[in-house]
Amino acid sequence: IDIFEKLELEDDDVLDTYLNAMFEKLQIDSQLAQASQGDLASQESITSQEDIASQLKEEIKLTRKDSTSLNDIFDKEIEKFEEEEFWRVKAEFEGFTAQLLNYKGKKAELKNESETDELLNSLNEEFYVQNVEAKNRNRETKAPFTTSSLQQEASIKLNFSSRKTMLVAQKLYEGIDLESETVGLITYMRTDSYRLSNIFMAPAKKYIEKTFGKEYVGSLKQAKKGPNVQDAHESVRPTSIDNTPVKVKKYLSKDEFSLYSLIYNRTLACLMKPAIISTTSVELKNNDALFRSQAQALIFDGYLKVYGKYESLELSVLPELVKDTNIKPLNVEKTQHFTKPPARFTEARLIKEMEDLGIGRPSTYSQTITTLKNRKYVSITEKRFIPSDQGRLTVDKLEEFFSKIISVDYTARMEKVLDDI
């Protein structure tokens, strides 16, 4: 401990080194072995059923976590969905458009064209400006990357599969040849922690102040710690703030550069001030109908200075409107729409679902998705999972014989019990 204090290190900064040294003398833990055996038993209860395999015309090679995830993808609500008609009304004015918000004191829900025409016929030629309000709000930065959030963000922003993300991250972690030496550019990429070490944060904040100004220096928000978080390693971050993406770009492949830039900028952003956005809202009354229009402007870019290219922000301006005055629209328009079924899972959403429900661990998310793809239980259409015929049949049979074992609740409780052991 005295050595830690002299070096200004925290215990967690040297935890990995300590554990690696201790591992050489580690004896087999009987409780861990029992946990592994218990997990294996629940897997084999699924994979060893010959009668089911014969009905499916193939051997079942799914773990309990794979089966639960496949069952999650095969959403019965989507299969039985029936679309419903609805209508929208908008009023176009000089320089802005307002959408119908309320009708007769209730949220506007126009089910058919006759109801819509009734509303349109009740409108006067002019709209009354009932309220004009402007408010500033903070747009907070997100937490540094865990394994799960890295896979999700890389899927959304870079179009990487979870497997590709982990392979590229592994390479960045193991080391890149930078001229005369091999350097690991990121910390360990299998983690569920939002922590950043003080050893990293101090120089990172100095870099932010020097590069962007003191007004951009923020602090790491304390993210809520979930019940299943083990917190063994700190979050995924660059090993050195000095290794900027521009500096190391010539040593990296295209994919390595894209992922490293994402990790570097996300880590930097989480130590910066929030962005400040001004939102102006206008409410327009016309008899029993209330319309609203909103616009937002960027007051202070904050963390968006480095992370803005990864986040969409629609900026617009409303003309000067005076409360308690009347304005005439250029046009009032009705449009027909139909409800859509719940969206099928993307890789990013499935990973988030597994994390939220406690299905598996960060190290298993990618393998679960890869298994479902390789076994052709699902296909990918427009970045979304579509269950194959074999996948549907497999889910039906698993639900018939193993409805309890593949349930989300059972799988999450099993993970918790095994962690406790």
PLM region spans:
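Core catalytic DNA strand-manipulation module of type IA topoisomerases
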Residues: I1-D39, E44, S48-I421
